[in-house]
From Swiss-Prot:
GO terms for cellular component: membrane. The gene is lpxB. GO terms for biological process: lipid A biosynthetic process. This is Lipid-A-disaccharide synthase. HAMAP family: LpxB (MF_00392). GO terms for molecular function: lipid-A-disaccharide synthase activity; phospholipid binding.
Amino acid sequence: MSSNNPHVFAMVAGEISGDILGAGLIKALKTRYPDAKFVGIGGPRMEALGFESIFSYEELAVMGIVEVLSRLPRLLKVRATLIDELVKINPDCFIGIDAPDFNIGLELKLKNRGIKTVHYVSPSVWAWRPKRIFKIAKATDMVLSLLPFEKAFYDKHQVPCTFVGHTLADDIELESDKAQARELLGLDKEAEYLAILPGSRGGELKMLAEPFVKAASLIKQRYPDIKFVTPLVNQKRRDQFEQALREHAPDLEIDLVEGQSREVMAAADCILLASGTATLEAMLVKRPMVVAYRVSPITYRIAKGMMLTKRYSLPNLLADDDVVEELIQADCTPEKIATAVATQLDNDFSPMYDRFMQMHKSLRCDASARAADAVIKLVEDKV
């Protein structure tokens, strides 16, 4: 590309967490390349910065092996169309943000056509399906990892990798203000609150809304004065959750909030949530938590056979220890969830808080700027 033309960066972000990372990277790249253009698949945060989406990022918001298979024809069509469009555009660099099952194949196709490729957010190759490292090596010029222990795995396999830290750790203050969050959300200043986060995908709510609301009913019996608050990413997810409430806990009162999941977590005394990036946010706002998750039985059996780790949540993976309780698959029952939440409400949080603070500091690296620096070095052939 001529030096007189603006730089063009192609990106694909698969869901909310990717949209957050993508927006941070766009801002950082714009400090170096103010006229740069950004195109691909992105979410509302990226689009607010001028990103041009060829497809809606909700196309990629699927979970589980079985669930992905049902959408496979559409996903393959989206990827094929995207490849054609990006080859025509010929960007300076393609950055696949998470969504590895979609992005790594896309990166391989683009790299074979002479486009530089970066994968932002290491797939959990150190936890399951480790042989993916060989495809990643072929598909990418650089991996940007969020977690400090990941780089050693890539170094071992001689795959270029830069640890950049996590934008959430940069964005979230070391001390979160519960009173301020409650005032913002209009919540009771004095009440004890359990935040309930059943996930952002339709498939997650399908699996988790029922056990979560049933658990909340049991918790209410033990703690009559406790209150509940749930953030939901959009109206579709709200409709799903309200349906679960009507069916399984019609007398239970839960404050429903549109978005603002971070504020909801900061406002809470304890958090019940699905495994995923939200567990990192819960750790960063430093609230006691219980992590629960389940998928279809077939998906679980297949995935379990490929797992190299017994831990699922990011706090436990970062600590390499069982810091927070995880209730996975058969353990994801209302009774076990309620018991685990009660334990958190009744016990001293100080030891867990100290671990959370230590991990927060380890991830605070000005991640977006470090990621942008790595991309710029690649684009300018300095790596």
